[in-house]
Amino acid sequence: MNIAKSIHFLSNKEALDKRLDRGLLGIRGRQADELSSLGLPVLPSVVIDATVSRSLYGEKLRSALSPYLRKFTLLNRKEYADAKNPMLLKVVLSPNLAISNYPVLHNFGLTRDTFAGFAERVGEHFATHEVFFLLKGVFGVLLGIAESEENTKGASEFVETLKEIEVFLQGGKSSPSGREAMNRYRALLPDGFFDDAYVQLEEAVRLVSKLLSFEEDGEDGVAILIQPMVYGNYGGGSYSGRFFSRNIITGEKKLQGQYFEERFDECDAEGSDVNAIKPAYLKQLQDIAWKLEDHSREIREVRFTIEAGSLWLIEQKPVEAKSTISLVRLLLDLYEREVVDAEYVVKSVKPGQLNEILHPVIDMTSVTGLKSSQGGIIGVPGAAVGRVYFTADSLIEAWRVAKMGGQDTRCILCMPATYAGDVKAIEVATGVLSNEGGYSAHASVVARQYGKISLVRPDMKIYSDKAVVDGMTINEGDFVTLNVPYYGESTLYMGAAQLIEPDPETSGLVSFIELAKGFVRSFHVRANADSPHDAELALAFGAQGIGLCRTEHMFFKEDRINVFRRMIFSENAEERTGSLKQLQKMQGEDFYGIFKVMQGHEVTIRLLDAPLHEFLPHGESEVSKFLEYLEKVCGKGLSREELQERISMLSEVNPMLGHRGCRIAISYPEIYAMQVRAVFEAVYRLQKEKISVYPEIMIPIVMNCRELKQIVYGKKIEGHAYQGIGSIEEEVRLALKAKEVDYKVGAMIELPAAALSADEIARYAQFFSFGTNDLTQTTLGLSRDDFNTFMPDYTMYDLVDGNPFAILDARVRELIEVAMQRGRLARPDIQLGLCGEHGSRSENIRFCMEVGLDYVSCSSYSVPIALLAIAQAEIENAEKEGRKPAWRGRSSAKSGGRRAR
């Protein structure tokens, strides 16, 4: 058989024929060809392609291979079969499938004649090790052949031989010398195997070919590669090493890895920083790294060997375990140098991955030795360290003491579940650890809003002063570390780890989001923000307004909660008015700050939604503190018994569907009136400062149009007059002698009844915002805080399609569409949005865009995620329509204002 046409040669100086079918080379062959075409210092290769690779057993190969071995000598400065400076070879199988189980064959050319010359350069011990490594590969092939031929006796003998060789390789017992090993296994090998290096190579290739011949119906297109071996311990000027093309945590464009001087195997060895290698070699390694990055558009892991001054690229592969920061910084670097365009950059990052950039990550070297427990439900990804406290009050007290004493203020709130009264603790905590609920539970939603970490551990038992998980006890005041990655298993560590803090600027997040925003058209993202700080963060992350300002969160601040409680428990209008004036001034300052930060953008203020039940003092400690406050402020107060009686009267069995939202406005009109006055006082104050403000007032938990009509326009019945928003605005405007501003009043659609009567509600609402957390609860009859207790069973029996508090349920989607259609029939220009944590998920965003909503609103920390999801949806839609996606962003610096390729 004439095999010459099926043998090919490649090196960094000699490329393969372009007409050659690359499918015949296998994966490794194609990679070697690709790298050689880049001019990288790859090992030269003889490639026996797939047309003959299974048919070489019995063929004379020496004459066909010898010319190529001489080419190896010219490049490698060593000669095959030379006694003094022998070149050794490896035989590599190159299948077309990435997953294969072929043995690796190294060190051909080690014979009785060449062993001494090789040992003189690398040492007797290492040379002997390489003999055993050669034997391991060959006997692996022989075992495969014996099993294919159903030669049970031969297979058994090879299995025992391989076991013995493995013991020698692992140093389990005193091994024979290299020459003794050649004699020891001589009878099991082809004749002359250790007598003639050319016979050895020829027999090795034949055996590999024979092994492949048994797989005619299996692996398709396996090539055989022959390459020279190079060693990092081959005398002076020899090194080995491994590195990443840039830092895989920070993304800094600097090699990250180690090198080893005069060593071949880096295992169990302490290396030196690769950047400290000789400058000439460092320059070569940098050129290799960044050529690979530009070509693959990925961070690469590179293994190299420098043998007697010559540098060789041994292996390169993508890096799976890298941070999102490193990926983003790589993409931005490629974009600035016009290697990729903005579209490629935006498509290369999954929206959820941005969570990692927005929160701290653990320095994994700092958790060695810490006890840990894996598992749990992701509330908010990231990492948090802090001392554990089991009530909001105990956490706040510990935080205050630590702050005053200049000590570590990091705290983690650990409770079964959290409620509105716990928000003040979440705000100062670094994270929340709970055992009820999941992604959409109150603890997770609030933590997300404040940029905190949240982990739910259903298997954790929480007591009054301790928690137990996986047999580990967490006492109050103990340090723990929460590691909640975007992908992979969450981990709870006992003790404090070191954290790497995020920086939106240096991480590249701000620049990345600017590129993504270039693809965003009319559909946009707003933020849920309750303070000027939240508003600033929202703008920094690319929000185009505030879609939800939860005013009840403002009342839970420490200096306000007792004022609000005093208002609730007031016995007469005079007392209540005094408290409301205090609250109005406080809220007015909040609104002023938020409007000022968001000048030029819409700000949606949701009037009080939380039930009064949530503002009541709970537990003996809160009751005592409130009684002390009343005594101090009023000079007199309620008795404990009177207070407990009033608390009982106001307590509700099911507050989520009870006295909340617009229902409070009907029963306590002065509360909403106070809030509306605070809004417009802030608006007209800013008007005098020449600052543009676009206020939107949203009424929550609307059930029918009559509720909204009364709140907006007021109502008079015999003996009663209800003042509407319009009348209050006019009152404030006239008192301040201001010019009327445009404002909108809208309804939060979070009940099926509201969705179905949207046409009637739209007569009085200029916008709808779909509150999908409550709409999901009221549509499906599910509690978001309790769903996870039975969700595993429902998932096991395939009774639900995923988590409806993460991905919108089909029936909730239908209600949204019905409400949109009916609302637009009544008011064609009605503005439509969705607020809540559903708004940051790609699947939900695509739905909102498809059905024609105008925006989504989510926590400030979710804004970049939502923007990226929108940009990717716009790109995908353009591709489906066969057009180039419209992009209105900044071109790379190199392009001088032109759009990058």
From Swiss-Prot:
Regulation: Activated by light-induced dephosphorylation. Inhibited by dark-induced phosphorylation. Both reactions are catalyzed by PDRP1.
This enzyme's EC code(s): 2.7.9.1
Superkingdom of source: Bacteria
Region (Central): 381-482
Stretch list, region C-terminal: 523-901
Keyword set includes Cytoplasm: no
Coiled-coil boundaries: none
Residues of the signal peptide: none
Processing after translation: Phosphorylation of Ser-440 in the dark inactivates the enzyme. Dephosphorylation upon light stimulation reactivates the enzyme.
Gene3D superfamilies: 1.20.80.30, ATP-grasp fold, A domain, ATP-grasp fold, B domain, Phosphoenolpyruvate-binding domains, Phosphohistidine domain, Pyruvate Phosphate Dikinase, domain 2
Remarks, miscellaneous: The reaction takes place in three steps, each mediated by a carrier histidine residue located on the surface of the central domain. The two first partial reactions are catalyzed at an active site located on the N-terminal domain, and the third partial reaction is catalyzed at an active site located on the C-terminal domain. For catalytic turnover, the central domain swivels from the concave surface of the N-terminal domain to that of the C-terminal domain.
Record family assignment: Belongs to the PEP-utilizing enzyme family.
UniProt protein name: Pyruvate, phosphate dikinase
Organism for this UniProt entry: Treponema pallidum (strain Nichols)
Lineage of the organism: Bacteria, Pseudomonadati, Spirochaetota, Spirochaetia, Spirochaetales
Gene expressing this chain: ppdK
